[in-house]
UniProtKB/Swiss-Prot annotation:
Protein name as annotated: Probable D-serine dehydratase
UniProt-recorded Gene Ontology molecular function terms: D-serine ammonia-lyase activity; hydro-lyase activity; pyridoxal phosphate binding
Cofactor(s) required, per the database record: pyridoxal 5'-phosphate
Gene: dsdA
EC number: 4.3.1.18
Species the sequence originates in: Histophilus somni (strain 2336)
Length: 438
């Protein structure tokens, strides 16, 4: 499909004008069909969950703040009723059902959703090396990975990654604490405080004046020249993806504890901010495994960086970038500032994702301020992208397509997945708050 031809498409023209759009995915095919395209299944997610469990004693020792959750990195699921009322008042639209916030923004160690996938892939690599060199067995107490002799062993190896910020933060901190030499290749969008935090752990931060795609490509290139360097590929990694996917079974457990039902009469809607796609894609995969067709997964992207929407809508996936259409990929949502989506995630998940919408930067600041005022919860701009999702779901086309009745909608649970912000310095947070209009 030629770019010139695409530019005649009225929907693409809206994207090119940076208009906010909502698109319900006609390729969404239900779980039975959709999962067959992924190339992974529930046993892969289960193995990831078991690996994280093996590392629990390590976390308790290396990161004492995780002791209260017995070394398991998991985020709170909280009700945001005051925010729900404020959204209804400000937008003059109803939100039926329960509105909850999944606070990956406050996950331990790196304060973002990337603490799921990024940390998991570092652990998988560390375990592989330690097992191959007979430093541990799978039945051992993994807290011994804190021992100096094992850290010295890991120091012979290095890890590289390209990032807009949060993935680099999770991989950099985890890798450095284990003893690895870590290089994080950071795009122009990356926040200065994230670079400083990484440097405080002894991580080598390589800065670029170009966007995320260049940082990843350069990181990959640098890693190729060193046989002892492991490159974590945010665009194509199934390991990262599986680390995120464990969230599905964890959420199911939280629902059991909170008495929340998910079934035909109690649908679940989850709104996930999307950058390159690994985090939301992996979480959505885990959610579909856990809840089947009763969960609806909606991706939210900035109007200036709608890369996954563009890839899935056109079917071109990583063969097209937003810049090809003159869309600049410049957004306040630094974690979502990605011009070309993951080809792996797009192709794997295009039959499981139910919808996409875009949101302008100013709304992110407005919603950030509103959440702060109503619930006293502070997030970074990217993390607010999912907050207007419940307003979109009232669209009659969506309800008609999925045969959702008003009664079912009244029983629905809406989850806004807060992807980051728990570690943002106060000075930076005050700047964000000053930009909100509400």
């Amino acid at each position: 499909m030629k770019i010139q031809h695409l530019m005649q498409d009225p929907f693409i023209q809206k994207l090119m004008r940076f208009e906010e759009v909502m698109w319900f995915n006609p390729k969404s095919a239900g779980v039975k069909t959709g999962l067959s395209y992924v190339g992974l299944d529930v046993s892969d997610t289960q193995q990831a969950a078991e690996r994280l469990q093996r590392f629990a004693p390590y976390f308790c020792r290396a990161f004492p703040e995780t002791q209260k959750t017995k070394g398991i990195l998991e985020s709170e699921l909280v009700s945001i009723d005051k925010m729900k009322s404020a959204l209804i008042d400000h937008y003059h639209m109803p939100i039926q059902g329960r509105l909850l916030l999944k606070k990956d923004s406050h996950l331990p160690i790196s304060g973002s959703i990337k603490a799921r996938g990024g940390i998991y892939e570092v652990l998988a690599y560390a375990e592989k090396l330690a097992l191959e060199h007979h430093l541990i067995t799978e039945s051992d107490d993994y807290s011994q990975l804190c021992d100096e002799k094992i850290k010295d062993f890991f120091s012979r190896y290095s890890i590289a990654v390209g990032s807009t910020g949060n993935l680099g933060l999770s991989i950099g901190i985890m890798g450095a604490v284990l003893g690895f030499k870590v290089s994080v290749h950071m795009s122009a969008d990356a926040r200065e405080w994230k670079k400083q935090k990484l440097r405080s752990y002894g991580v080598n931060v390589v800065e670029y004046t170009q966007d995320y795609g260049v940082a990843v490509a350069q990181g990959r290139k640098a890693a190729l020249s060193d046989p002892n360097c492991f490159f974590i590929d945010d665009e194509n990694s199934t390991t990262l993806f599986l680390g995120y996917s464990v969230a599905g079974q964890r959420l199911k457990q939280q629902f059991l504890e909170q008495g929340i039902k998910v079934d035909e009469n109690h649908p679940l809607f989850v709104y996930l901010p999307c950058g390159v796609g690994g985090g939301p894609g992996g979480v959505a995969f885990g959610l579909k495994l856990a809840f089947g067709d009763y969960v609806h997964c909606i991706f939210a992207e900035p109007t200036h960086s709608p890369c996954m929407l563009l890839g899935v809508y056109t079917g071109l996936h990583d063969k097209i970038a937003v810049q090809d259409l003159g869309i600049d990929n410049i957004t306040a949502a630094d974690g979502l500032a990605v011009g070309r989506a993951s080809g792996f995630v797009g192709r794997a998940m295009e039959h499981l994702l139910d919808g996409f919408y875009t949101i302008e930067d100013q709304k992110l600041y407005d919603l950030l301020g509103l959440l702060h005022k109503t619930e006293n919860i502070q997030l970074e701009p990217s993390a607010l992208a999912g907050m207007i999702g419940p307003l979109h779901i009232n669209h009659s086309d969506y309800l008609r397509r999925y045969h959702i009745t008003q009664e079912q909608l009244a029983n629905a649970t809406h989850i806004v997945w807060a992807t980051g912000g728990g570690m943002v310095p106060d000075v930076e947070m005050q700047k964000y708050l000053s930009l909100g209009r509400f």
